[in-house]
Amino acid sequence: MANEIIIVEGKSDSQKLKKIYGENLITFETNGLGIDDKKLNSIKELSKKNKIIIFTDPDGPGKKIRETIIEFLDVDVFNAFVSKQDIDKNSKKIGLAEASEEAIKKALDNLITYNKKNISISWDEYVKNDFYIKANRIIIANHFNLSEDMSSKSLFKWLNWMNLKVKDIEKIIGE
């Protein structure tokens, strides 16, 4: 994972990834929602020479951190996702550190590129094709290991960031 920096929420996430991939893996810890302008500017500086991979927890704060970073950067951002189902059932936390090694490897092998400049579908297309309906949102969310609780507005934004076209989304729903 040369020239890659994985953005995680905390120390235990970094430790888990380094246990799997070795101590040479480079992570950047946001310290949860404590991500501030200084950290965002550091990430922006790192993005000039490195591939940025966001790998946050599959919960509300993780989603917020991911959106904050994507909105701040002007480059393609790579995203790794684990789902809540990938978390150890005996854990009280819903974090990356509690995910299985297999789920982490799968997530990092299946990165999704986001770019905030992408506009691949319009709101009219989104509504006309019933992508906003909860049942369809759940199918789409599960396909990408996103939260099933994601709002219609957020999903619309994220689908654009992924540069998905109507036919791509229809294919996902039809699977």
Swiss-Prot record:
Alphabetized GO MF terms: metal ion binding; ribonuclease M5 activity; rRNA binding
Record localization: Cytoplasm
Biological process, per Gene Ontology: rRNA processing
Gene3D superfamilies, alphabetized: 3.40.1360.10
Needed co-factor(s): Mg(2+)
E.C. no: 3.1.26.8
The Toprim domain, residue ranges: 3-83
Source taxon at top rank: Bacteria
Cofactor annotation comment: Binds two Mg(2+) per subunit.
Disulfide bridges in this chain: none
Main localization, broad class: cytoplasm
GO CC term (a single one): cytoplasm
Residues given in the record as Mg(2+) 2 binding sites: 57, 59
Record Pfam families: DUF4093, Toprim
Reaction equation(s) it catalyzes: Endonucleolytic cleavage of RNA, removing 21 and 42 nucleotides, respectively, from the 5'- and 3'-termini of a 5S-rRNA precursor
Keywords: Cytoplasm, Endonuclease, Hydrolase, Magnesium, Metal-binding, Nuclease, Ribosome biogenesis, RNA-binding, rRNA processing, rRNA-binding
SUPFAM superfamilies from the UniProt entry: Toprim domain
Residues at which Mg(2+) 1 binds: 9, 57
Function, as annotated: Required for correct processing of both the 5' and 3' ends of 5S rRNA precursor. Cleaves both sides of a double-stranded region yielding mature 5S rRNA in one step.
UniProt record similarity statement: Belongs to the ribonuclease M5 family.
Name under which the protein is recorded: Ribonuclease M5
Species: Mesoplasma florum (strain ATCC 33453 / NBRC 100688 / NCTC 11704 / L1)
Gene of this entry: rnmV
